[in-house]
Swiss-Prot record:
It comes from the Bacteria. Its EC number is 4.1.2.48. Catalyzes the cleavage of L-allo-threonine and L-threonine to glycine and acetaldehyde. L-threo-phenylserine and L-erythro-phenylserine are also good substrates. It catalyses: L-threonine = acetaldehyde + glycine; L-allo-threonine = acetaldehyde + glycine. It is an enzyme of class 4 (lyase). This is Low specificity L-threonine aldolase. It comes from Escherichia coli O157:H7. Keywords: Lyase, Pyridoxal phosphate.
Length: 333
């Protein structure tokens, strides 16, 4: 089965599984798991931050990030289509009494700082206190411009706001920039990394920031049910991924660009391609039929009027050629 629904469908390689089986473990709630500690230290080192915390999921990592920045009755400014606003079940509001203030992102995925400024609340008892600006990099595959990251950082310093980056796919941005992680993360107070998307682990995310912030995050992780015991088995997969699966993300980007060109040549309406994602307009009338057609040929896609295809380490160029051939045949019916 060729699965292009998301890079979350990746499976651990044999080498990763061997690293997991060989991992020394301890009780991480006590802080005694050496593999978890090594992963957290390595993430902090890569990013130039002081500390990191390993969590089961990206949704929990984002929730803990917001809870550790904001008190009840405070708010964060966020994009309308941001994952930690739209796709995480309203956790910040429901569990943290943190008010989201969404704004529309620009075409390049940035939140225009003039619009952000207009949403910062005055010091008035009628309003929630604005505490945090939350960005996403990459955002729907788009890499935020480097200069914007610097501008957003300086903007938040001037306005006494914290800056968090949902970096679920931040290493896709790192590869696209051709930079080191710390070149991006110097411009934020905290950020997350999802290890189970393009990096290929079965589970796990990291939240990274300064020591005091991560100390608060450890308490919130425990409160929200994320304290794990011998989790070094999972952390070993994360360590393997960070040391072996980052540079290869360029292959996913190249495959996505190649696939976009193949589909264009086949007559498909390819809207855009960024990093490891491409978006193809198929229309309401063709969405279900295309999904069924592809599934019958052992290809899984999200059947919707605009299809998002995501390349990853478990999909080869040869398999993408098969998908392109099926797409061409579907259009020629």
């Amino acid at each position: 089965m060729i699965d292009l629904r998301s890079d979350t469908v990746t499976r651990p390689s044999r080498a990763m599984l061997e690293a997991m089986m060989a991992a020394p473990v301890g009780d991480d709630v006590y802080g005694d798991d050496p593999t978890v500690n090594a992963l957290q230290d390595y993430a902090a080192e890569l990013s130039g931050k002081e500390a990191a915390i390993f969590l089961p999921t990206g949704t929990q990592a984002n929730l803990v990030a917001l809870l550790s920045h904001c008190e009840r009755g405070e708010e964060y400014i966020v994009g309308q289509a941001a994952h930690n606003y739209l796709f995480e079940a309203g956790g910040a509001a429901v569990l943290g009494s943190i008010q989201p203030q969404p704004i529309d992102a620009a075409a390049d995925g940035t939140l225009p700082l003039d619009k952000v400024a207009m949403k910062i609340k005055p010091d008035d008892i009628h309003f929630a206190r604005t505490k945090l600006l939350s960005l996403e990099n990459t955002h729907n595959g788009k890499v935020l411009p480097r200069e914007y990251l610097k501008d957003a950082w300086e903007f938040t310093r001037e306005r006494n706001l914290a800056l968090h980056v949902d970096g679920a796919r931040i290493f896709n941005a790192v590869v696209a920039y051709g930079s080191e992680l710390k070149e991006l993360t110097q411009y934020c107070d905290s950020f997350t990394i999802c290890l189970s998307k393009g990096l290929g682990t079965p589970v796990g995310s990291l939240l990274v920031g300064n020591r005091d912030y991560i100390k608060r995050a450890i308490r919130w992780r425990k409160m929200t049910g994320g304290g794990m015991r011998q989790s070094g088995i999972l952390a070993a997969a994360g360590m393997y991924a960070l040391k072996n699966n980052v540079a290869r993300l360029q292959e996913d980007h190249d495959n996505a660009a190649w696939m976009a060109e193949q589909l264009r040549e086949a007559g498909a309406d390819v809207m855009r391609q960024d990093t490891n994602m491409l978006f193809v307009r198929v229309g309401e009338e063709n969405a279900a039929a295309l999904g069924e057609y592809m599934k019958a040929r052992n290809v899984l896609i999200n059947a919707s009027p605009i299809v998002r295809l995501v390349t990853h380490l478990d999909v080869s160029r040869e398999q993408l050629a098969e998908v392109a051939a099926h797409w061409r045949a579907f259009l020629a019916r």
